[in-house]
Amino acid sequence: MLHNPTGKERLALAFLLGMLAILGPLNIDMYLPSFPEIAKDLSASASLVQLSLTACLVGLTIGQLIVGPVSDAQGRRKPLLICIFLFALSSLFCALSPNITTLVAARFLQGFTASAGLVLSRAIVRDVFTGRELSKFFSLLMVITAVAPMVAPMTGGAILLLPFATWHTIFHVLMIIGFLLVLLIALRLKETLPLEKRIPSSIGTSVKTMGSLLKDRSFMGYALTVGFIHGGSFAYVSGTPFVYQDIYGVSPQVFSILFGINGLAIISGSFIIGRFGGIIHEKSLLRIAVITAMIATAVLLTMTMIHGPLATLVISIFIYMITIGMVLTSTFTLAMEKQGHRAGSASALLGMLPLLLGSIVSPLVGINETTAVPMGAIMFVTAVIGSLAFFGLTKERVGQNS
């Protein structure tokens, strides 16, 4: 069993867990540049294409709720191997989809199986690290994970430039990544949850564990904070392919760059937490992040209402994504530090809420395909609600932590 690894072993674990964690972002972001092509090829509306993203998010949500508790009972390694293998197969099903209905169904399966990478990478970190090392490794994992939203759409756009490539090719690439990850897990990942720390598996036990988490006021405060603020970012994920390309007229490759630079924003936000977390309490940094998120999205909404220059949208979203990096890193650290044996279930709930909200808001962005206002409005409202959750449900700890 691993415990607080150092040196090369630590770096190897960071790489492996980072690869698992980015499976979700790759699954979400890599095919975004092909949205207009998918709509044309499958004779589908923008909202129907966005529904394929919603299906993926629903799959990620439900999958985490199942995989998390199962891993608390069965260990991390076996469920991970099974799910990632099935992810590779479901990616092939996506590539072979002849119509939008089949693609939506295949995307649900793809999201469901990819959920293991998200939830179990975090649970493994909690198994292996404690205290300040837990916070530092979460920050490192977030930096690795943040590269995916930057690289994924660029990779997707680059793939579409190949003379033989279509949107199907992107899913073939995801299939190959899945099979490579299966080999990596089988060869390099040790079990991190010892038998004596496992929770007996049953529906009743899973419900009881989730119930205890839902009653934990502080935990739910952090969960709802990341749920709404990060969940609202999926309005940007599903909206910008059409806003940037159809409303502002940029090419798929330029869109990929504009979308991808926000990975740098997430990295910057995560770096701020990792760099200053030992000097300023993470809750104080989180407070700054949620306030900044409200301000940035208020500016974004204003710019969409007056049809401001593209640069104003890009800058507002970049600042907003810095706060996403801060919120993701700090909320997971603050929420997970006391979860111990129920880390898998806690990780599942933390990962589920943003995806659940994202699955709701994604198709709403396409209600009016001629304006970016729905995207801006959704991002602003979710930032406000997330901030209210933070200030309302975690305030009992402000005195002792700040």
UniProtKB/Swiss-Prot annotation:
Location (main, coarse): membrane
GO molecular function: transmembrane transporter activity; xenobiotic transmembrane transporter activity
Tree of life domain: Bacteria
Subcellular compartments: Cell membrane
Bilayer-crossing regions: 11-31, 48-68, 80-100, 108-125, 140-160, 167-187, 219-239, 254-274, 286-306, 308-328, 347-367, 373-393
GO cellular-component term (any): plasma membrane
Keywords for this protein: Cell membrane, Membrane, Transmembrane, Transmembrane helix, Transport
Pfam family, one: MFS_1
GO biological process, one term: transmembrane transport
NCBIfam families referenced in this protein's UniProt entry, alphabetically: efflux_Bcr_CflA (TIGR00710)
Family the UniProt entry places it in: Belongs to the major facilitator superfamily. Bcr/CmlA family.
Descriptive protein name: Uncharacterized MFS-type transporter YdgK
Organism: Bacillus subtilis (strain 168)
Origin organism lineage: Bacteria, Bacillati, Bacillota, Bacilli, Bacillales
